[in-house]
């Protein structure tokens, strides 16, 4: 919005020419989302308490009993700050910006319905896994349909380390990308089981993809690093900046001991957005590295359930997702969180290193 109002005045006021730079607007999108989140956070948390949006705790995780009643649905705060920031600093004529907002909002709506159902039933059981998966797939399909219709966007799949291996999947690219979106969304959701555990790695992955997105939208840098160039993609860096800022602002209140939880409205929307960012910049497979922690958490659940069914009740882990396994081994929650953050940073650096390994 500010871009559309102020940049046209740059002919009379040369200082306003800075609004044409994506980097400038991305930094301010970050700062705006951060400040909005921190400023309205205390009032928002008090409101959640007043309307009794308290978290219900799994009986199996007895060490979390003291967290019962902590306000949830904090993802609404993330969403509000992010959307306001993007609307202020983004070029609202950019179709990719609107598509990532569609994914973020759509997945967030599914998460909101899940959280609302839990609160209404006064349990930790929300929407059924099948209905949640179905709605996620519908939103992903709609977003991908509009994305592949863009003339500048390609359905070619880029493989890390192999610059000449770029098969064109055609319409098969849509179901593949849908799996990336839904898998990423549920991966963040599974990771969100401790104070600050999910939002930290989400911010790290957001930083990684902000770099990939900016490069994908810059013809010269993309050509030099031999990554797919997508005209107009650089504008999505503004969304990445807002995501990072809103995430850091939320961490201010979600860090151990948490004053608020993001809920599914936060984890599903952020995870879906990260998956779509990977698709937008043609780094779908890099999501496995940049979001390595989410992959590990998801794999722990898949292995646990599969092994349990095959062996008639035996388990690989004491409890899944993986962070609960370490928790039940007696490792303090704060130490698990910091160690997982360190792992996410390492995964992020590994993902960025791929830029020079072609």
Swiss-Prot record:
EC number per UniProt: 2.7.8.13
Enzyme class label: transferase
Localization, UniProt: Cell inner membrane
Gene Ontology CC: plasma membrane
InterPro entries documented for this protein: Glycosyl_transferase_4, PNAcMuramoyl-5peptid_Trfase, PNAcMuramoyl-5peptid_Trfase_CS
Molecular function (Gene Ontology), one example: UDP-N-acetylmuramoyl-L-alanyl-D-glutamyl-meso-2,6-diaminopimelyl-D-alanyl-D-alanine:undecaprenyl-phosphate transferase activity
Necessary cofactors: Mg(2+)
Domain of life: Bacteria
Biological process, per Gene Ontology: cell division; cell wall organization; peptidoglycan biosynthetic process; regulation of cell shape
The reaction(s) this protein catalyses: UDP-N-acetyl-alpha-D-muramoyl-L-alanyl-gamma-D-glutamyl-meso-2,6-diaminopimeloyl-D-alanyl-D-alanine + di-trans,octa-cis-undecaprenyl phosphate = di-trans,octa-cis-undecaprenyl diphospho-N-acetyl-alpha-D-muramoyl-L-alanyl-D-glutamyl-meso-2,6-diaminopimeloyl-D-alanyl-D-alanine + UMP
Metabolic or biological pathway, per its Swiss-Prot or TrEMBL entry: Cell wall biogenesis; peptidoglycan biosynthesis
Alphabetic keyword roster: Cell cycle, Cell division, Cell inner membrane, Cell membrane, Cell shape, Cell wall biogenesis/degradation, Magnesium, Membrane, Metal-binding, Peptidoglycan synthesis, Transferase, Transmembrane, Transmembrane helix
Residue stretches spanning the membrane: 21-41, 69-89, 92-112, 133-153, 169-189, 196-216, 233-253, 260-280, 285-305, 335-355
Pfam assignment, any one: Glycos_transf_4
Topology versus the membrane: Multi-pass membrane protein
UniProt record similarity statement: Belongs to the glycosyltransferase 4 family. MraY subfamily.
Function, as annotated: Catalyzes the initial step of the lipid cycle reactions in the biosynthesis of the cell wall peptidoglycan: transfers peptidoglycan precursor phospho-MurNAc-pentapeptide from UDP-MurNAc-pentapeptide onto the lipid carrier undecaprenyl phosphate, yielding undecaprenyl-pyrophosphoryl-MurNAc-pentapeptide, known as lipid I.
Protein known as: Phospho-N-acetylmuramoyl-pentapeptide-transferase
């Amino acid at each position: 919005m500010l871009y559309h109002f102020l940049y046209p005045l740059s002919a009379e006021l040369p200082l306003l020419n800075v609004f044409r730079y994506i980097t400038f607007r991305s930094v301010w999108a970050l700062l705006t989302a951060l400040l909005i989140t921190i400023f309205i956070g205390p009032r928002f948390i008090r409101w959640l308490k007043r309307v009794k949006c308290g978290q219900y705790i799994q009986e199996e995780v007895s060490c979390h009993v003291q967290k019962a009643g902590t306000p949830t649905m904090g993802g609404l705060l993330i969403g509000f700050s992010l959307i306001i920031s993007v609307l202020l600093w983004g070029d609202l004529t950019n179709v990719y910006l609107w598509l990532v907002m569609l994914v973020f909002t759509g997945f967030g709506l599914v998460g909101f319905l899940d959280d609302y159902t839990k609160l209404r039933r006064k349990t930790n059981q929300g929407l059924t896994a099948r209905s949640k998966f179905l709605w996620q797939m519908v939103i992903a399909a709609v977003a991908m349909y509009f994305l592949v219709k863009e003339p500048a966007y390609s359905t070619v799949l880029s493989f890390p380390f192999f610059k000449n291996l770029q098969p064109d999947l055609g319409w098969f690219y849509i179901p593949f990308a849908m799996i990336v979106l839904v898998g990423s969304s549920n991966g963040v959701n599974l990771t969100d089981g401790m104070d600050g555990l999910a939002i930290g790695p989400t911010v790290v992955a957001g930083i990684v993809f902000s770099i990939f997105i900016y490069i994908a939208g810059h013809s010269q840098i993309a050509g030099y690093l031999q990554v797919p160039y997508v005209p107009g993609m650089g504008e999505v860096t503004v969304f990445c900046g807002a995501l990072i800022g809103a995430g850091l602002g939320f961490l201010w209140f979600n860090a151990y001991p948490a004053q608020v939880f993001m809920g599914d409205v936060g984890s599903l929307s952020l995870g879906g957005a990260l998956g779509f960012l990977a698709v937008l910049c043609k780094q779908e497979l890099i999501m496995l590295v940049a979001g390595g922690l989410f992959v590990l958490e998801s794999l722990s659940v898949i292995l646990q359930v599969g092994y349990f069914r095959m062996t008639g009740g035996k388990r690989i882990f004491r409890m899944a997702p993986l962070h609960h396994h370490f928790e039940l081994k007696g490792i303090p929650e704060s130490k698990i969180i910091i160690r997982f953050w360190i792992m996410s940073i390492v995964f992020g650096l590994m993902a960025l290193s791929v830029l020079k390994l072609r």
